[in-house]
Amino acid sequence: MIMSKETLIKSIREIPDFPIPGILFYDVTTLFKDPWCLQELSNIMFEMYKDKGITKVVGIESRGFIMGPILATRLNAGFIPIRKPGKLPAEVIEESYDKEYGTDTVQIHKDALDENDVVLLHDDLLATGGTMKAACELVKKLKPKKVYVNFIIELKDLNGKSVFGDDVEVESVLTL
């Protein structure tokens, strides 16, 4: 698996100064367009969670919507979207969080989860952890049995894992 992870890392496109000057953007869409990379990513994540009893995979808009449903299918679980305000049609609950230049909000359907669910919360990249921390707090409001958090990539130098409590297992497929 070490060789496959190295191949996946080499397949990620790096875009300097995007979305603003000084930022190095890791473009995971290159993993999705390559059939081998997509399958390998799916296999690795499945192996990480196949014995955890996952009942729902929750993906964060928008790149969490790519691997989330694939993983949900493989785990025989449902898929639940977390979206920006105004995008979900039924009654929602929400969580707001601070960003570098203001605040943002994420929402989930109020009836998306219950106390019987074991949740895998997924997004593409862990940087500072703000968005996923808000998503995690949002999911916890619905009182599932357990919450796992997963990323494709973790930017280790930004120490995003530190925002999560000890009650949440946070794992990444790749660490940069």
UniProtKB/Swiss-Prot annotation:
Compartments, as annotated in UniProt: Cytoplasm
The entry's keywords: Cytoplasm, Glycosyltransferase, Purine salvage, Transferase
This enzyme's EC code(s): 2.4.2.7
GO annotations of cellular component type: cytoplasm
Pathway: Purine metabolism; AMP biosynthesis via salvage pathway; AMP from adenine: step 1/1
Coarse class of the protein's main subcellular location: cytoplasm
Organism superkingdom: Bacteria
Single GO MF annotation: AMP binding
Pfam family, one: Pribosyltran
GO biological-process terms attached to the record: adenine salvage; AMP salvage; purine ribonucleoside salvage
SUPFAM superfamilies for the chain: PRTase-like
Entry's transmembrane regions: none
Catalytic activity: AMP + diphosphate = 5-phospho-alpha-D-ribose 1-diphosphate + adenine
Subunit details: Homodimer.
HAMAP family: Aden_phosphoribosyltr
Family listed: Belongs to the purine/pyrimidine phosphoribosyltransferase family.
Function comment: Catalyzes a salvage reaction resulting in the formation of AMP, that is energically less costly than de novo synthesis.
Protein name: Adenine phosphoribosyltransferase
UniProt lineage: Bacteria, Pseudomonadati, Bacteroidota, Bacteroidia, Bacteroidales
Gene that encodes it: apt
